[in-house]
Amino acid sequence: SPALDDEHNDNFLRL
């Protein structure tokens, strides 16, 4: 899950 990935976590929190 990219949303839970530290590297792509920003995308999930940018919601």
Curated annotation (Swiss-Prot):
Principal localisation: secreted
Family to which the UniProt record says this protein belongs: Belongs to the FARP (FMRF amide related peptide) family.
Organism name: Striatophasma naukluftense
Compartments in which it is found: Secreted
Recorded superkingdom: Eukaryota
Name of the protein this chain belongs to: Extended FMRFamide-12
Chain's role: FMRFamides and FMRFamide-like peptides are neuropeptides.
Residue numbers carrying Leucine amide: 15
Record key words, sorted: Amidation, Neuropeptide, Secreted
Gene Ontology CC terms, in alphabetical order: extracellular region
An individual GO BP term: neuropeptide signaling pathway
